[in-house]
Design a protein with these regions (language model features):
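Short alpha-helix in the alpha/beta-hydrolase fold that links the catalytic acid
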Residues: 168, 206, 220-229
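Short beta-strand/loop motif that positions the catalytic acidic residue
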Residues: 204, 210-212
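Conserved alpha/beta-hydrolase catalytic His-Asp/Glu region
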Residues: 9, 124-125, 143-203
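Conserved HGGG/HGGXW glycine-rich cap/lid loop of the alpha/beta-hydrolase fold
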Residues: 7-57
């Protein structure tokens, strides 16, 4: 645990070396990086996977700014708390927005970026995310949180539904049922404004790896090319037979690509 301006942040930490900070997406937590923590630590990196406020097992205070800028600021505060001046940032899905925002505002602190089907370019939202942004509808949807709903969402996110396990369903559902968690998730969804990131993305100069699933049903694979147009220095890896969560659905391929990308860039 790490205290950041009165907010208790849950972290998973392992290894020694250059810091790699993993940031999860919507309605997720550090469990999303379960397949990356040990391989990156064994490759001589200091691995930290955080739970953003209101997610996983971090606190969900009403005074936290559940916006892109608020979570971007929190990333900087976490780095300060870890006494780290520089970092390699790894982001999945909606976690891309605060990570990119932080990189744009503090380029001197970011050695490299790894984006796994990340937000940061204009795109349409899946139906569920549009619904929960509606007043009252989002609050009422808390009543329907169940293993079957979580399984449905994960199956949509994977190209191969057989890879969705009961353990995964339970792991993603459990934190959402904690007091304050669903309300914090709603505030995050409703406060998300990608404008600053979209307008300033091409200012990023650090090395970037873009990883995408060819069968991503939520962020079409064409988004990876749009990202590449804004970040011409980026390396792009497209995984076949893979959906929205490459680091979870094809972790061995993801880890191999990411660790190879980092060779010689930060050590």
């Amino acid at each position: 645990m790490l205290e950041v301006e009165g907010v208790t942040i849950h972290l998973i930490s392992e290894g020694k070396g250059p810091l790699v900070l993993f940031v999860h997406g919507s309605q997720a937590w550090s469990y999303a990086w379960r397949y990356q923590i040990k391989p990156f630590a064994e490759a001589m990196y200091r691995v930290v996977a955080l739970d953003l406020p209101g997610n996983g097992y971090s606190a969900a205070p009403s005074y936290h700014g559940y916006s892109v800028v608020g979570n971007s600021r929190l990333i900087g505060q976490v780095l300060d708390g870890l006494q780290a001046q520089q970092v390699i940032l790894v982001a999945s899905s909606a976690g891309g927005l605060p990570v990119l925002d932080f990189t744009i505002r503090h380029p001197e602190r970011v050695c490299a970026l790894i984006l796994s089907s990340a937000c940061g370019m204009p795109h349409s939202l899946p139906g569920l995310w549009n619904l929960i942004r509606l007043t009252l509808v989002g609050e009422a949807s808390r009543l329907f949180l169940s293993p079957s709903l979580i399984r449905k969402n994960l199956v949509e996110a994977f190209a191969d539904p057989r890879k969705v396990t009961r353990e995964d369903v339970e792991a993603y559902l459990r934190p959402l049922l904690r007091p304050g968690s669903w309300g914090a998730n709603l505030r995050t969804e409703r406060s998300t404004d990608p404008t600053f990131v979209e307008q300033n993305l091409n200012s990023i100069r650090c090395p970037v790896l873009i990883v995408w699933g060819k069968e991503d049903a939520w962020h079409p694979v064409a988004m990876s090319e749009t990202f590449h147009q804004q970040l011409p220095q980026a390396e792009v890896e497209i995984f076949s037979n893979c959906g929205h969560l490459p680091h979870e659905e094809q972790p061995a391929c993801f880890n191999q690509s990411a660790l190879k990308f980092l060779e010689g860039k930060v050590k």
